[in-house]
C-alpha cells in the first residue's frame, strides 16, 4: 500500500536537515541535492539507505543516479513504499 506523499516528503526533509545541517523549511520538491544542498555521493547513498530501510523500497544504482531533486526522490518512494502496522 502506497504511503502518503507528504509523509515521505517530511521524512526526506528531516533526514536532509539532520545530516546536512540545513533548514528543513527551505527544502522543497524542487530542491536539487547537489546544487542546492551540496550533498555528495555519500550523503545521497545514506538517504537512499534510510528510505530503503524505512519504507521497504529497493532502489537500483541506476535509479538513484536519475534522482536529482527532493521531489523526484519522494515520487519514486511514495507509490512503492510498504507500510508496517
Residue ranges and their predicted role:
Residues 65-84:
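C-terminal structural segments of small proteins and small subunits
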Residues 44-67:
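Phosphopantetheinylated carrier protein domains
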Residues 21-22, 39, 57:
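Helix N-cap/coil-helix junction residues
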Amino acid at each position: 500500500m502506497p504511503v502518503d506523499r507528504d509523509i515521505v516528503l517530511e521524512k526526506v526533509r528531516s533526514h536532509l536537515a539532520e545530516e546536512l545541517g540545513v533548514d528543513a523549511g527551505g527544502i522543497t520538491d524542487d530542491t536539487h541535492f547537489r546544487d542546492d544542498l551540496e550533498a555528495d555521493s555519500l550523503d545521497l547513498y545514506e538517504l537512499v539507505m534510510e528510505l530503503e530501510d524505512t519504507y521497504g523500497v529497493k532502489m537500483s544504482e541506476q535509479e538513484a543516479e536519475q534522482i536529482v531533486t527532493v521531489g523526484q526522490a519522494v515520487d519514486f518512494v511514495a507509490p512503492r513504499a510498504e507500510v508496517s502496522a
